C-alpha cells in the first residue's frame, strides 16, 4: 500500500523486495548486511538517472543478534553493527552502511551517503499496517489533518553543563530558523526557565512536561530536543517519559522529532519487550510522531549541534523549486559534516519513511494592505484600543494570486518579542536571557474567496505599550491545499483613544453540549463548552496581567485553568467565539464550575454552573 501511495501520489518508481530475495541473489541464501548493500548498489549504478536508486526503506525492526541466538529476537531487517562492542561511544547500530555506494567506499560504513535511508522499527503485521496508515494519512492533505499547527516549531533544551544545551538552541539553532524560515512561529521550552520541584525520585520540572504534552496534543510541525536523554526519555528531570508518549492522541497533527540526545531511539535490542522511547513515539497508534531523526547510542554535544544546524539548513531549503524528502535531509546533513568523527554521526538514524516530506504548506499568504495602506509603504503603527483591518491574497510560488482558492484563513497577530531569563538552578549554570514572541494581539478566522481575504479586529488594552515590530502569521486551507505566510510590517505600541465600552462579555456555559442544564449528571471528564461574545472582542492575549479566560472548579483557585489557547473565534468575527476544553477527571459528587472572561478593554464577566 505504501508503494502504491508513492507511485500514485509522488510519481515515484517503487519496488518491494523481501529479505529472502536479496539473500538468495547476493549471499547464497544466508542473512548478511552486505547483501542488502550490494543490492542497493546494483540499483544505484543503473545508468539511467530516472532509474537510479534514491530512497531505501528498511521495513522491519533490527537486532544486534544477527544469528538469532536470542529467543523471540527482533531481527526483521538486519542492522549494521560496528566492530567495537565495549566502548559505549564507538559501539552503535547504523543504517548508513546500506547507502554508502560509491566505489572504494563503505568499508566500516566510511564514506558519503548516496541515498536516503529510513527504517520502520515494526515487529508485527499490526504495527506495520499502523505505520503505513500514518504515513499515508500524513502525506494526503484533507480537512482532517490541515491546520495552523503546520506553522509552529517547538524547541526544548536541557539544563546543566554550564548552559551548553540552552546556548546551542537559543544562540545557534533558533537564530538559524528565524533567518531561513521566518514564516514559522517558535515555542521554546527550556528546563532552566522553570522552577524545579523536589520529589522522592529527584528534581522534576512538571511545567516542562506539560509544555511538551500541550505542543504535541494541540499540534506542532516539529519538536527539537537538545540535551541528555536515554532509552526511557529526556533529561534527568524526566521531562518526557514513555508513559506520556503512550498517552498521546494527536493522530491528526503528528510532528517530526529531531532529538540531539543519547540513544533515545535504540531499536536493535533483541528483547521485544524492551522498546525505546523513540520507538514508542513512532509506534503510537493514536498519534505520536510521523518520523524521528534520532540516535541509537551515545551522542556528543559538539557533533550534535553541527549536525542539527545542517539538518535545519537542509530541511528548509528548496532545490529545483522543491523541498527535500526526509531521506535527503538526513543524508545531506550527514555528508556536510565532513571531517567529524564518523561514529558520532552514524548513530543518527531516520525512523520513518525516507520518501516522505515535512507537511510544508504549498502556497503563500501575503498581506497587501494594513488599514487601507499598501504594505509596501511606511510601516504602520498600531496602538492599543484601535480597530485594525488587514487585507491580503493567497499566491503561488511565483507570487501570482490564486484566484481559484476558496477556503478559510487562520490568523495570529503577535505582540513584540519579549526578553526572558533562565534561572541558573543547577551548579555551574547561570541565568541567561532568551527571547520569545508568544503574546497574542489577536487570534481569529476569516473566509478566503477567490484568493482574497479581509480581517478586522480591535487591539487590546493589555499590549506592551513600548514600540516595536509585531508579527502577523497566516495559515490558509481548503479541503485539498494549504498556504502560509507572515508579515512584520506592523509596528505595535502606544495607546489609542479611550473606549466607552464598560460592559463585559456575554457567556453561555455548558458541559458536553448546548443541551446541558444546571444540576444535570455528567461523566467524570466532561467537555467544557462556552460561547462568548463581546462588541469589542474577547481578551486572549495572555500576557500575565490576569485578564485571561479562566475556569475554576468548586470555587478553589488552586484548580483554576487558563483557557486562552482553547478559544476559537467564529469565522469572520472578532466579537464572538467558543471555548472547548476537556475537563480533568472529576471525583464523584456535586461540583460547580465558574468561567471568568475579559474583553479587550478589560471589562470582565463570569458565570457559574453546577
Residue ranges and their predicted role:
Residues 359, 490-505, 510-512, 609-610:
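Flexible, low-complexity linkers/stalks enriched in Thr/Pro that connect modular domains
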Residues 383-389, 521-528:
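Short coil/turn motif common to extracellular beta-sandwich-like domains
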Residues 370-376, 508-516:
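Short, solvent-exposed loop/edge segments of extracellular or virion-exposed proteins
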Residues 470-474, 505, 526-530, 577, ...:
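Short, well-structured beta-strand segments within conserved domains
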Residues 392-402, 514-517, 531-541:
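Short amphipathic, basic-aromatic surface patches that mediate peripheral association
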Residues 454-460, 578-584:
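Exposed aromatic-hydrophobic patches
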Residues 400-410, 420-424, 535-555:
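Solvent-exposed loop/turn segments flanking beta-strands in beta-repeat/beta-sandwich domains
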Residues 1-445, 449-458, 466-468, 476, ...:
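Cysteine-dependent hydrolase recognition
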Amino acid at each position: 500500500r505504501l508503494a502504491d501511495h508513492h507511485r500514485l501520489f509522488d510519481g515515484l518508481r517503487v519496488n518491494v523486495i523481501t529479505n529472502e530475495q536479496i539473500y538468495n541473489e547476493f549471499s547464497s541464501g544466508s542473512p548478511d548486511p552486505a547483501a542488502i548493500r550490494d543490492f542497493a548498489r546494483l540499483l544505484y549504478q543503473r545508468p539511467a538517472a530516472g532509474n537510479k536508486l534514491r530512497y531505501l526503506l528498511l521495513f522491519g525492526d533490527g537486532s544486534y543478534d544477527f544469528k538469532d541466538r536470542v529467543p523471540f529476537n527482533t531481527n526483521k531487517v538486519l542492522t549494521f553493527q560496528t566492530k567495537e562492542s565495549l566502548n559505549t561511544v564507538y559501539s552503535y547500530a547504523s543504517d548508513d552502511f546500506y547507502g554508502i555506494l560509491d566505489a572504494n567506499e563503505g568499508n566500516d560504513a566510511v564514506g558519503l551517503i548516496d541515498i536516503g535511508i529510513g527504517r520502520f522499527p515494526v515487529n508485527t503485521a499490526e504495527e506495520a499496517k499502523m505505520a503505513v496508515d500514518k504515513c499515508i494519512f500524513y502525506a494526503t492533505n484533507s480537512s482532517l489533518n490541515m491546520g495552523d499547527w503546520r506553522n509552529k516549531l517547538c524547541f526544548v533544551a536541557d539544563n546543566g553543563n554550564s548552559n551548553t544545551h540552552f546556548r546551542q538552541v537559543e544562540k545557534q539553532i533558533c537564530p538559524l530558523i528565524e533567518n531561513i524560515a521566518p514564516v514559522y512561529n517558535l515555542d521554546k521550552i527550556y528546563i532552566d526557565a522553570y522552577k524545579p520541584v523536589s520529589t522522592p525520585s529527584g528534581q522534576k520540572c512538571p511545567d516542562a512536561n506539560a509544555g511538551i504534552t500541550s505542543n504535541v496534543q494541540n499540534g506542532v510541525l516539529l519538536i527539537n530536543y537538545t540535551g541528555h536523554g536515554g532509552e526511557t526519555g529526556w533529561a534527568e528531570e524526566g521531562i518526557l517519559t514513555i508513559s506520556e508518549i503512550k498517552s498521546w492522541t494527536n493522530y491528526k497533527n503528528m510532528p517530526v522529532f529531531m532529538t540531539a540526545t543519547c540513544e533515545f531511539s535504540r531499536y536493535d535490542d533483541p528483547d521485544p519487550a524492551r522498546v525505546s522511547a523513540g520507538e514508542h513515539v513512532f509506534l503510537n497508534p493514536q498519534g505520536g510522531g510521523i518520523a524521528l531523526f534520532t540516535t541509537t547510542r551515545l551522542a556528543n554535544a559538539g557533533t550534535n549541534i553541527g549536525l542539527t544546524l545542517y539538518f535545519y539548513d537542509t530541511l528548509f531549503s528548496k532545490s529545483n523549486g522543491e523541498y527535500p524528502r526526509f531521506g535527503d535531509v538526513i543524508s545531506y546533513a550527514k555528508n556536510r559534516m565532513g571531517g567529524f568523527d564518523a561514529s558520532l554521526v552514524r548513530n543518527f538514524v531516520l525512523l520513518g519513511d525516507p520518501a516522505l516530506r515535512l507537511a510544508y504548506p504549498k502556497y503563500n499568504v501575503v498581506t497587501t494592505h494594513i488599514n487601507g495602506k499598501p504594505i509596501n509603504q511606511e510601516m504602520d503603527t498600531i496602538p492599543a484600543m484601535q480597530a485594525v483591518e488587514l487585507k491580503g491574497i493567497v499566491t503561488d510560488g511565483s507570487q501570482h494570486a490564486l484566484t481559484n482558492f476558496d477556503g478559510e484563513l487562520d490568523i495570529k497577530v503577535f505582540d513584540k518579542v519579549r526578553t526572558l531569563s533562565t534561572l541558573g538552578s543547577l551548579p555551574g549554570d547561570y541565568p541567561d536571557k532568551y527571547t520569545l514572541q508568544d503574546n497574542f494581539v489577536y487570534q481569529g478566522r476569516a473566509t478566503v474567496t477567490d484568493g482574497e481575504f479581509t480581517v478586522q479586529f480591535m487591539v487590546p488594552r493589555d499590549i506592551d505599550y513600548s514600540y516595536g515590530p509585531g508579527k502577523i502569521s497566516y495559515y490558509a486551507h481548503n479541503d485539498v491545499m494549504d498556504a502560509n505566510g507572515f508579515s512584520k510590517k506592523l509596528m505595535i505600541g502606544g495607546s489609542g483613544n479611550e473606549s466607552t465600552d464598560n460592559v463585559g462579555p456575554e457567556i453561555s456555559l455548558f458541559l458536553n453540549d448546548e443541551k446541558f442544564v444546571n444540576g444535570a449528571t455528567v461523566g467524570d471528564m466532561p467537555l467544557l463548552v462556552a460561547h462568548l461574545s463581546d462588541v469589542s472582542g474577547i481578551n486572549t492575549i495572555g500576557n500575565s496581567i490576569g485578564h485571561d479566560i479562566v475556569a475554576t472548579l468548586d470555587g478553589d483557585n488552586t484548580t483554576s485553568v487558563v483557557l486562552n489557547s482553547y478559544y476559537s473565534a467564529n469565522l469572520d468575527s472578532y466579537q464572538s467565539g467558543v471555548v472547548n476544553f476537556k475537563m480533568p477527571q472529576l471525583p464523584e459528587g456535586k461540583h460547580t464550575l465558574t468561567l471568568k472572561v475579559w474583553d479587550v478593554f478589560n471589562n470582565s464577566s463570569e458565570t457559574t454552573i453546577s
